[in-house]
Amino acid sequence: MKTKTIFQLVALFAIGATAAPTGCGETRDIQAEAVKPRDVAASQTLHLDARSDIIKGGSSNLERREIWYWCRIGNCNAAFKSLAARCRHEKTAVHIAPESDSDSE
């Protein structure tokens, strides 16, 4: 009976040890998350405790940039606000050239 109890305790310890967090995984410090207002230089960051002050000041204080996606084919200078729009554009007949017609002449 004593052996069975010892075995159960060892098994319980083994299960607990494998289920317990080891700290080896990706850990992120919440305080390291930062928000950059327009007035702050690129090398400076603000911690989350100062974030509430920025939010109270309004979202206009935060720097927001539009992302543009440019056509990657040839000399086309088309710009799009979404990746899906760029992909649709690249698949259009504008960029699907027929086999070179100049070879048949």
From Swiss-Prot:
Protein location: Secreted; Host nucleus
Zinc finger (C2H2-type) residue numbers: 69-95
Disulfide topology: none
Induction conditions: Expressed during multiple stages of host plant infection, including the prepenetration, late biotrophy, transition and necrotrophy.
The entry's keywords: Host nucleus, Metal-binding, Secreted, Signal, Transcription, Transcription regulation, Virulence, Zinc, Zinc-finger
GO molecular function: zinc ion binding
An annotated GO cellular component: extracellular region
Main location: secreted
Top-level taxon of origin: Eukaryota
Signal sequence range: 1-19
Family matches, as InterPro entries: Znf_C2H2_type
Keyword hit for Amino-acid biosynthesis: no
Keyword Zinc-finger in record: yes
Function: Probable secreted effector that translocates into the nuclei of host cells to reprogram the expression of targeted genes by binding on effector binding elements in rice.
Name assigned to this protein: Host transcription reprogramming factor 7
